[in-house]
Design a protein with these regions (language model features):
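A glycine/threonine-rich phosphate-anchoring loop and its flanking beta-alpha core
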Residues: 30-128
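Generic hydrophobic alpha-helical membrane-span motif
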Residues: 24, 45, 80, 177-178
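General beta-strand structural signal in soluble alpha/beta enzymes
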Residues: 13-15, 36-38, 73, 167-169
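Active-site segments that bind and position negatively charged phosphate/pyrophosphate groups
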Residues: 119-239
């Protein structure tokens, strides 16, 4: 439908946030035209990325698109957006702690290519959000500016690295697993960043608990060292909660057995090494699952 309506036009402007932006990017990519976005919420990091998620046959897939030509925003509009949408944006950005750790883990353990320029851009944008976290929680101008800038930088970092590594790790795999669950049941799907925020809490705890795991395994020392640079899950939960985001999967209406299934199987979502893959390789989830369920369900 979008492609049909865009025929004959050389430019499409999406007015909105995630879904409309994705549709415009994909449609104009296929037609060889250009697009822009007038953002109405700082809710996700796909504004400037070169890929777009699509729902195909009841599954979530990521396909090539192109980045927008222009990004327009009125910060009075962004600040007035529903708090949960700003919370979703915060969930997507604070997830970058885990994304970068997962990427570095894969680089050091598996030799995956690492792009320092993309990682440095993401770290700097993340630091600005941490510095303005109080204003973000209050949906204040400075905080929303920092958050929106970080969301744009995240897209640029993906373009620079040539993939979504700077912006997507195990927490996104958890989100995508749950998205498929909601899709197949025909139920309303919670905002992407809301689910990613929950996945971030799980990933942070998975990293932090490694130092107390008695079992020795390849990569443990590296993972524990990476965990030292990560914030405490309680801090991230406080930020998300202040914006109205859930901090337990039960708040999404997901059954406990589905969350348990997610913990054991979401690594299959994508062939990408993360802390979740580390747990699978070393059979760590069997001893961690009950603990994670008690904390986050």
């Amino acid at each position: 439908l979008a492609e049909e309506r865009a025929k004959g036009y050389g430019y499409v402007l999406a007015v909105g946030s995630g879904t409309l932006n994705d549709i415009a990017k994909y449609t104009t990519f296929r037609q060889g035209t250009e697009c822009g976005v007038y953002a109405t919420a700082a809710s996700m990091d796909g504004f400037t990325s070169g890929v777009t998620p699509l729902i195909c046959g009841g599954n979530k897939v990521t396909v090539n698109a192109h980045t927008v030509r222009h990004v327009l925003a009125d910060f009075s509009v962004l600040c007035a957006a529903p708090r949960i949408m700003t919370g979703a944006g915060a969930g997507d950005i604070f997830a970058k702690y885990c994304c970068l750790a997962d990427w570095r883990l894969s680089h050091l353990l598996k030799g995956e290519a690492w792009n320092e320029e993309a990682a440095s851009l993401m770290r700097a944008a993340l630091a600005q959000c941490v510095e303005n976290v109080g204003s973000i929680a209050a949906c204040g101008r400075e905080g929303v500016e920092a958050l929106f800038a970080a969301l744009l930088v995240s897209g640029y970092a993906m373009v620079i690295s040539g993939n979504s590594r700077p912006a997507s790790g195990a927490e996104h795999h958890m989100s995508h697993f749950l998205e498929v669950y909601f899709l197949r049941r025909g139920e309303h799907i919670p905002l992407h960043g809301v689910k990613v925020g929950l996945g971030t809490l799980v990933s942070l705890h998975m990293y932090k608990r490694l130092k107390d795991v008695p079992q020795d395994f390849a990569g443990k020392e590296i993972a524990v060292k990476l965990a030292e640079a990560l914030p405490e899950p309680a801090w991230a939960a406080g930020v998300l909660s202040s914006l109205g985001c859930p901090t337990r999967f039960s708040q999404l209406g997901v059954p406990e057995d589905v969350v348990r299934d997610m913990l054991f199987n979401c690594w299959k979502i994508r062939d990408r090494y993360t802390v979740m893959t580390l747990y699978r390789e070393n059979d760590l989830m069997r001893s961690a699952a009950d603990e994670l369920i008690s904390l986050f369900y």
